[in-house]
């Protein structure tokens, strides 16, 4: 084989390797971001079951959830359109509103919506063959 053929083979292997590495990094970023949000949701849910929503601990956890989401959302916006994941931030703001208005049913519904968004976003944001091609 000539040098030209070897160069083409090595180039293709390097490009495919880079694409695979990018997809793996993307997948890890998405998974860790949404796992943190999911962990906060379950922690908030446990505290609400024990003490109700009118509690400083719940407000603090929701603030932590909001901060965590803002940090991760900026990184996720490089992977998808911001409007696709904007609903998550809206629901987090609603959580804070429901704490102030002392509406536990709406609070829990909003928390369930956040968990639902986490699950659905993981399906369309993960690495797949379309990303590689």
Where do the language-model regions lie?
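Short, charged, intrinsically disordered terminal tails
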Residues: 123-133
